[in-house]
Amino acid sequence: GYGVVVACGGRLGALDGGVFALPRAAALERRLAALHAGVDELVARYQPTALAVEDLYFGRNVQTAMAVGQARGVVLAAAGARSVPCFSYTPQQVKQAVCGTGAADKGQVQRMVAALLSLPAPPEPDHAADALAVAICHLHRLPTGVAIASAAGAPARATGAARKTRSARREVAL
């Protein structure tokens, strides 16, 4: 899923959210190419100051972990090609930022995403709601995240974006 959230003057708003329609029957390389094109199109359209992704953990399902890892690499490469800094958050960090507890369930997260973004109903499908939650998490943690990223040698653009407190910040989460 993907979500685009803007922060302006302490208020949050959803600009876009959904899931990428990837051809299930196509070969892996075609699906990954379609994902790259989708991410590139979102980044070109919304020109986000950052891209945030969720760290996912898979116990014993190696195939799922590999597929998600490949998709994550494509997302990071698409952002890197456009010089958009990337940040990563654990599911617990996302839940804590959105709901106030890292133990929140999926329904709580969806309801809080709707409330924080002033949406009439929780976003659907679930993957879109999750992506919007990751973007909210990033916006809530931005000053800290940028300081950590800058210390680690991240592009100066990330630091500059954090200083633009009066202008709108657009974040894409995948």
Where are these regions (language model features)?
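Phosphate- and other anionic-substrate recognition elements at nucleic-acid/protein interfaces
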Residues: 1-174
